[in-house]
Amino acid sequence: DPWSGNGSAQAGDLIKVDVGCLVNGYTSDTGRTYVLGPPEDLQARLHDALMKGFIAGSALLAPGIALAEVHVVTQDAIRAAGFSDYTRGHFGHGLGAGLGSEEWPFISADATTVFEPGMVMAFECPWYITGVGGLIIENQVLITETGHEMMNSLPFDLIEV
């Protein structure tokens, strides 16, 4: 079950870490995936597909780009990496109301919003699979006048612990 469990982590288990903080009224949201011991082949392939989606979608994070376009490109990249049935309602969201809060605007297929300079978004590529676990690559992103700035420097790798 990717959502919960009542046992201890075992070798091969994925550890999805999705964290944030609240400082002076500003919230953050970042996520990474770890694996206890060496990753299984499927785990590595899933993470690689999410990374391809993250890279493809990130390339479009700039003023004037429709959030819906980022959704399409991100999902298409993950599907092209060998997972044609992958579907996700959104690949990110606004920040600000509180920790653990996913708020408008959403990077979704039906979004009508376009990115503007000064927007701060959480851009994410998650996947939750029963029998495998939960994976996520997520960064907080500032939309700048000319593109975007990732707001942390954590590694994106599937990290073995």
PLM regions with names:
Residues 1-161:
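Active-site neighborhoods and metal-handling regions in enzymes and metal-associated proteins
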